[in-house]
Amino acid sequence: MMLIFASNLSLKLKNTTMIFKKEIQKLKLNQIITIRLLLILFAFTSACSSISCSDDDKNKNTEYPGTTVDVGTHKLMAYSVSKQSKYLVVFESGHGNDHTSWYSTGKSSEILSISDYLDSDVLLYDRAGYGKSGLNTESRDIKKLRSELETVVNQFANGRKVVLVGHSLGGLIIRDFAIKNPEKVAGLVFVDASHEKYNHYSQDQINLFYNNYKTAYGSNSGIALETLQLIEDFKYTATLPNLPDVPLIAITSMKTDAEHNLADRQLWYDSKESLKAGVTDFTHITTTKSGHFIQLEEPKLVLDNIRKIVSKLPI
């Protein structure tokens, strides 16, 4: 189940930006109560829209089959398309999102058009506690999430190098993967990725978020357990060395709104600029047309830049 995958995209984006607003502690009590109610309301709307509530929708959107990946303590559900390409493009979703957060049409068959557009094998999956993946009650920190990504990649890559594409919190996961497995990585794409130089949380914030998610999704849901680790996650990623020297593209939203003024967006941009340390082929693309979910509002922008990375790689 996703964090805020409501049919009304503007509501989803507004919710997400509120979650990642670093000064929420300044909100008055009545505003906090309002946010809690809205999160639960939008979560219910999300559940309905993401599972296609009507019979007509179910008939129109036949579910794309997945493959289970055994990571020892639980199983994850992965979705792939094979074209026997030299490289494998792997998508890592953000906090609170399952693999469908990459589907701008909302149809599971979109994985086929993504693969066709990239002319490449592609792999998407759901972390524990999302979609059809199993639950895991262990600490869901970045190191654990990266370890599970390694298992998923190993099952599908068959020795090939991968192009990693990470959205939001997924950016932290692919960073850790690339640094720990430089020999397996051919390229990187960061889509409005989280970064420790921007994202800062107090324990009170984490408690508020966790209680909301526990109420909406359950204490063992992926979003709830990942939330508990956010403070430690950003402390951990602050200790990571530079990324491997592979082609890297960062795509960043510079769209302003009531919660994100120009100064805030500049800090967001600057945090992604730090990814270029030690990288000789670095491109930073900005957009004011999309909010946090660039892959949904401007899917072609994201796919074109993934394709650009793939085109640079040795044949």
Give residue spans per PLM region.
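Active-site loop/oxyanion-hole signature of alpha/beta-hydrolase fold enzymes
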Residues: 124-163
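Bacterial N-terminal signal peptides
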Residues: 37-47
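Conserved hydrolase catalytic core segment
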Residues: 160-197
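Conserved HGGG/HGGXW glycine-rich cap/lid loop of the alpha/beta-hydrolase fold
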Residues: 77, 81-132
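Bacterial Sec-dependent N-terminal signal peptides
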Residues: 19, 45-65
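Flexible "cap/lid" loop of the alpha/beta hydrolase fold
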Residues: 191-220
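Catalytic active-site module of serine/aspartate enzymes centered on a nucleophile-bearing elbow/loop
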Residues: 290-315
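Conserved serine/cysteine hydrolase catalytic core
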Residues: 218-286
